[in-house]
Amino acid sequence: MSEETIVNCPTCGKNVVWGEQSPFRPFCSKRCQLIDLGEWAAEEKRIPSAGDLSDSDDWSEQQP
């Protein structure tokens, strides 16, 4: 007996079965997948950062 895992589409909230029958998972459709990609590209979404990265401008891979 196998249980289906159901997740909500991050874009529209529709139920999506997590499995081979849902090729765009966790999204319900290609449309929702592209909407999400567009939001990341437009910087409407971002991963929060706890630190101040202002000192990273002087960073270099070269050894002193």
Curated annotation (Swiss-Prot):
Write out the ranges of the annotated region (Disordered). 45-64
| Disulfide topology | none
Compositionally biased residues, Acidic residues: 54-64
Q: Which domain of life is it from?
A: Bacteria
- Extract the PANTHER family matched here: DNA GYRASE INHIBITOR YACG
Tell me the function of this protein: Inhibits all the catalytic activities of DNA gyrase by preventing its interaction with DNA. Acts by binding directly to the C-terminal domain of GyrB, which probably disrupts DNA binding by the gyrase.
By what name is this protein known?
Answer: DNA gyrase inhibitor YacG
Annotated source species: Klebsiella pneumoniae (strain 342)
